[in-house]
Amino acid sequence: MSMEFDAVIIGGGVSGCATFYTLSEYSSLKRVAIVEKCSKLAQISSSAKANSQTIHDGSIETNYTPEKAKKVRLSAYKTRQYALNKGLQNKAIFETQKMAIGVGDEECEFMKKRYESFKEIFVGLEEFDKQTIKELEPNVILGASGIDRHESIIGHGFRKDWSTMNYAKLSENFVEEALKLKPNNQVFLNFKVKKIEKRNDTYALISEDAEEVYAKFVLVNAGSYALPLAQSMGYGLDLGCLPVAGSFYFVPDLLKGKVYTVQNPKLPFAAVHGDPDAIIKGKTRIGPTALAMPKLERNKCWLKGISLELLKMDLNKDVFKIAFDLMSDKEIRNYVLKNMVFELPVIGKREFLKDAQKIIPSLSLEDLEYAHGFGEVRPQVLDKTKRKLELGEKKICTHKGITFNMTPSPGATSCLQNALVDSQEIVAYLGESFELERFYKDLSPEELES
């Protein structure tokens, strides 16, 4: 078996698998490979246990500006359209209602203004008053005594929407389709990249077991591990990484659909939301929490897996200055401390209950169950030159046949849009072709028309 490929993707999560499919379906490349360190695809951030299983299209994510929502909507619709085209309904993609709610006069005023801006972007977006919310999500309104909550409450959303995705199942489908299209493609599991070497016009990917795979172009879609790999080759030395781990709590099956809350614009992390779980029937997931930890990947034991690569990246005065500036802000400091408390036994559950009751006011302590084994680390990039936290996705383009992607949420939602960008870069570098019109025709006819 030849170990030489036109392009090799490091990382078998949904982003890497989406690019594997996109190159196989729409480009003239002959051979593409994925190398993945785990024994199966999509076992870390793309696992159904690691994320909220949401297609983040911007309609109920209250931290999105209208401009960002327009872009994210098109990205999300590509991923949704692919799943529907491939018949993945009720296998990978699920239909449910969804809404964002504002609680209290200040948040209600914000939601009213937001609706006026967003109804033009999302056709069919509906405003919900308190009575309508009670009809759609009775447990959002009913208190423990069976009496309606006293706060003013308003929301908007969709009564029915393809809003839930099992990204692990989607990843598997991407790869199955790619292998049908190009039988010479390969997937290498249990291949943890130790080193990447440039050898003339080819890159050698060397595993911890001394196996070697060769590529004319390397795309690193390895989540938290992307930046350490980049820095091992001398790229991205001006960057650091703040790994933030999210945790969830289970409650009984009390929500009919997704319920999101208003996010504090000063905080770079999602506000608490409720999601009926797609893989564990009869459970609703509430979260996430957000806890910074010195690990590139979450493990059951807190001390297990502390990353030496991360310590090497972050043990310098610039990173400490960024951390100090963040913690100097009272709201951010209180948020960080509160989320540290959420992880503590007994007291954490009691404190988290207060946040969860914003969504389901009748919740009791007995209803909450810490979701062990759920949640994962998201790499937040630190710019050591600007001394600031960089929000969103980060890309290091070397223009030398290797690109590094760091894709925190909503990277899974945008996987096909990101795959399009990366695929176009790869084919341009290799002098190959890409069927852009057919890509849009299949996945985003709206963009083709415009």
Curated annotation (Swiss-Prot):
Keywords tagged on the record: FAD, Flavoprotein, Oxidoreductase, Tricarboxylic acid cycle
Catalytic activity: (S)-malate + a quinone = a quinol + oxaloacetate
GO biological process, one term: tricarboxylic acid cycle
EC number: 1.1.5.4
GO cellular component terms given for this protein: cytoplasm
Required cofactor(s): FAD
Alphabetized Pfam families for the sequence: Mqo
Any one Gene Ontology molecular-function term assigned to this protein's record: 2-hydroxyglutarate dehydrogenase activity
Main EC class the enzyme belongs to: oxidoreductase
Biological or metabolic pathway of the protein: Carbohydrate metabolism; tricarboxylic acid cycle; oxaloacetate from (S)-malate (quinone route): step 1/1
Family, similarity comment: Belongs to the MQO family.
The protein's name: Probable malate:quinone oxidoreductase
Native species: Helicobacter acinonychis (strain Sheeba)
